[in-house]
Amino acid sequence: MKRLFSLVFIGCFLFCIQANGQGTLSQAKAEPGNRLPGFAVNPISGEQEKVFVYAPGINIHINAPSESLFDGNKPTKLVLYALPNGNSTAWTIGKAPEEGDDWHFHIQNIGAQTRYLRATARDCNWVTVYLEADSKSWGRWRKAGPMRDYKIKETVEYLLALFSEYNPHIELNSHSGGGNFIFGFMDANTEIPGYVKRISFIDSNYNWDDKRYGNKLKQ
């Protein structure tokens, strides 16, 4: 049953992000073979990664293509992925199966799906941004302090600005309770900004309010 759920989830994620086909990293565009400033190179995959906490309590893990694949002349898709309740970033990325693994490692596999997209859809730079609330619940995080929705908006704008030299746009994605991140972003904006090209809910639209959000999506 867990394997079936994993396969269904993978199909949903790939469909959601492929359906339609401010500080900066650098003052000059990266050419293929160049390193993104401030990023570490994963010794196993070669992917470029940046991990940090954006106050208050937003754990961010950015996974960008390897030096040889990142092309500053191509547009950059920033796929923001708000984690489901109770899940860690490591679980969400996934890993090769080993005996004794926690089963959570094998139900999302966003890391493998990202690599698949990079290998098959080469018209852009695929950058996956994992967004984990320190409370492991975006709903709880939003209620933990004032102006939290505007902090979500600020976080999205910061990430966009970080890649401003590379023709970026934002694609908002969420799984389960991660939908609260998207609703917080929508609540903080009077209309959906033009830099957001797609919004996807993977079983995460529990708090949907048609009057509150419907018109914003129609615009």
Residue ranges, per PLM feature:
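Alpha/beta-hydrolase active-site loop
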Residues: 111, 130-165
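Bacterial N-terminal signal peptides that target proteins for export
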Residues: 1-8
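Bacterial N-terminal signal peptides
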Residues: 8-16
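Short, surface-exposed "cap/lid" segments of acyl-processing enzymes
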Residues: 55-61, 66-123
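A domain-start/cap signature at the N-terminus of enzymes
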Residues: 21-78
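Gly/Ala-rich beta-loop-alpha elbow adjacent to hydrolase catalytic centers
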Residues: 174-178, 182
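Active-site signature of alpha/beta-hydrolase-fold catalytic machinery across serine-
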Residues: 184-188
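The feature captures the conserved acid-bearing segment of alpha/beta-hydrolase catalytic domains
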Residues: 190-219
